[in-house]
């Protein structure tokens, strides 16, 4: 960060939009911009991080559930949190680790909601109907308790929160455009969960692209 005199967290949306703490990028020539983005990716590649997410297409979610549940639909974040934590926990089990869940701090209300979701996983297991989720092999409450080590909120300036933010956008875009360059780079460099598990396990253990029924994924 010192080389570029960066004095703010590495937030993906600000970097891509060249706004707020990264507005100076707009004043640099193309070669300088490309050098910055390449060095940023080198950082992402070098750290011992594996990308995994739950990505929900909002139009697809509304199309699938609005008529059936109207305003009683679950918050998207409950679905995303539960699935992402469970899949990370399953991988942690495979490699013999326990899992720390370290969400980025937001505000008191939303922070409390996430902590509640975490507690529900350890008390009750996954919140989905058994008949529709059985084939995913959901973890039991006991398995969650054995695998989840702690829940701790992190500030936006936390290195782990910044890395999670940088990884999230390419993983999201990969659901819509398989050839998205940052997504392809992470994939080719073995930085995604799919690179560490057999292809037949992707449906249950890889990044979950949920409610993508209406999405025509570009190659």
Write out the residue ranges for each language-model feature:
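Phosphate-ester processing/binding pockets and catalytic centers
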Residues: 1-219
């Amino acid at each position: 960060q010192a080389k570029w005199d960066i004095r703010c967290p590495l937030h993906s949306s600000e970097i891509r939009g060249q706004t707020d703490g990264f507005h100076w990028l707009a004043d640099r020539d193309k070669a300088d911009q490309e050098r910055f983005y390449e060095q940023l990716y080198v950082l992402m590649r070098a750290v011992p991080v594996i990308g995994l997410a739950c990505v929900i297409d909002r139009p697809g979610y509304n199309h699938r559930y609005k008529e059936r549940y109207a305003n009683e639909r679950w918050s998207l974040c409950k679905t995303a949190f539960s699935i992402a934590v469970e899949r990370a926990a399953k991988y942690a089990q495979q490699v013999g680790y326990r899992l720390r869940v370290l969400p980025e701090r937001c505000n008191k209300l939303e922070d409390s909601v996430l902590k509640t979701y975490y507690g529900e996983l350890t008390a009750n297991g996954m919140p989905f109907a058994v008949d529709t989720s059985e084939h995913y092999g959901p973890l039991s409450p006991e398995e969650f308790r054995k695998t989840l080590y702690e829940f701790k909120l992190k500030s936006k300036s936390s290195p782990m929160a910044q890395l999670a933010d940088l990884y999230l956008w390419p993983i999201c875009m990969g659901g819509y455009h398989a050839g998205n360059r940052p997504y392809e780079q992470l994939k080719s460099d073995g930085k995604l969960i799919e690179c560490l598990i057999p292809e037949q396990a992707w449906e249950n253990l890889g990044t979950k692209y949920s409610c993508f029924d209406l999405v025509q994924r570009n190659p």
